[in-house]
Amino acid sequence: MLTTEKLVKLLKLELFTGEKGLHKPIKNTDISRPGLEMAGYFSHYAADRIQLLGTTELSFYNLLPDEERHGRMRKLCRPETPAIIVTRGLEPPQELIDAAQEMDTPLIVSKDATTSLMSRLTTFLEHELAKTTSLHGVLVDVYGVGVLITGDSGIGKSETALELVKRGHRLVADDNVEIREITKDELIGTPPKLIEHLLEIRGLGIINVMTLFGAGSILTQKQIRLNINLENWDKDKLYDRVGLNEETLQILDTEITKKTIPVRPGRNVAVIIEVAAMNYRLNIMGINTAEEFNQRLNEEILKKGHQSKEN
């Protein structure tokens, strides 16, 4: 659970008062700048958000009659408000200090510009409050593409990852991949701390990839873009031989491209994954070889059809 205390510590912010409220949970990634509230309109006040007070808000507040000031700040400091932050190194008004102490609302000061701090807070909150899950598989950075290798236990995922690392690519996680959905369409994979940098090879045991291959062979996190699912070759199954069939894998609320690779002796799976990653990069650049081939094939069929009619 993310608390105001953790926010202050990780972002190196300065607590001015309200230390009794540091245990308050932060559940919302949105940040509010209470401009209308400064004018007295609290009908739709988002009290569960972090409140940012900058030059604009405090300049308007200073224009208010003395008899309205304390009541205005008292309404701003609610029991569910995780924190109020005064930016640009401004001095918090005494009425705000009194209200924060009365309601145990953490009052934080920062020298950062309001928009700059809002950007930092949003990025931090989206990361900390992101939806999470974990998957059995291996995550490897192949030519800059985060490739999640999945498949049944014993299919050869870790051995394939080892071959990819030997070929200059980078391991992120083996066996268990922790995944955060930072924003929609952005999945970040990380390794569990216990098995970070480690790779399990059956018959060999656990190896430390960073020790064996150097710091350039590992990453601590990577955006997942492509799923390669390994399965034993089924002679009765029709596998995609052209590349027109688009499979996807849904993780949380995000779908990523999925490719199923049949495994059997003689197939170099690591090379196939390298080509799949390069082909994925071409696809997002707008170059689709399968569609180009299909278009040429259709044109050739139409051409021969016209020739047959003419004859």
From Swiss-Prot:
The residues that hold ATP are G151, D152, S153, G154, I155, G156, K157, S158
- Region of interest: Important for the catalytic mechanism of dephosphorylation: 262-267
> Which reaction does this chain catalyze?
[HPr protein]-L-serine + ATP = [HPr protein]-O-phospho-L-serine + ADP + H(+); [HPr protein]-O-phospho-L-serine + phosphate + H(+) = [HPr protein]-L-serine + diphosphate
- One BP annotation, GO: regulation of carbohydrate metabolic process
Gene3D superfamilies documented for this protein:
HprK N-terminal domain-like, P-loop containing nucleotide triphosphate hydrolases
Enzyme Commission code: 2.7.11.-, 2.7.4.-
Q: Where is this region: Important for the catalytic mechanism of both phosphorylation and dephosphorylation?
A: 199-208
UniProt keywords (A-Z) are: ATP-binding, Carbohydrate metabolism, Kinase, Magnesium, Metal-binding, Multifunctional enzyme, Nucleotide-binding, Serine/threonine-protein kinase, Transferase
- Spell out the molecular function terms from Gene Ontology: ATP binding; magnesium ion binding; phosphorelay sensor kinase activity; protein serine/threonine kinase activity; protein serine/threonine/tyrosine kinase activity
Query: Entry's SUPFAM superfamilies?
Result: HprK N-terminal domain-like, PEP carboxykinase-like
Q: Which cofactor does it need?
A: Mg(2+)
Q: Where does Mg(2+) bind?
A: S158, E200
**Active-site feature positions:** H136, K157, D175, R241
Name the enzyme's class.
transferase
Query: Matching CDD domains, A to Z?
Result: HprK_C
Q: What is known of its domains?
A: The Walker A ATP-binding motif also binds Pi and PPi.
Family annotation (PANTHER family):
HPR KINASE_PHOSPHORYLASE, PROTEIN YJDM-RELATED
Which family would the database say this protein is a member of?
Answer: Belongs to the HPrK/P family.
Fetch the HAMAP family from UniProt. HPr_kinase
Q: What is known about what this protein does?
A: Catalyzes the ATP- as well as the pyrophosphate-dependent phosphorylation of a specific serine residue in HPr, a phosphocarrier protein of the phosphoenolpyruvate-dependent sugar phosphotransferase system (PTS). HprK/P also catalyzes the pyrophosphate-producing, inorganic phosphate-dependent dephosphorylation (phosphorolysis) of seryl-phosphorylated HPr (P-Ser-HPr).
Q: How does it assemble?
A: Homohexamer.
Remarks, miscellaneous: Both phosphorylation and phosphorolysis are carried out by the same active site and suggest a common mechanism for both reactions.
Q: What is this protein called?
A: HPr kinase/phosphorylase
Organism this protein belongs to: Staphylococcus haemolyticus (strain JCSC1435)
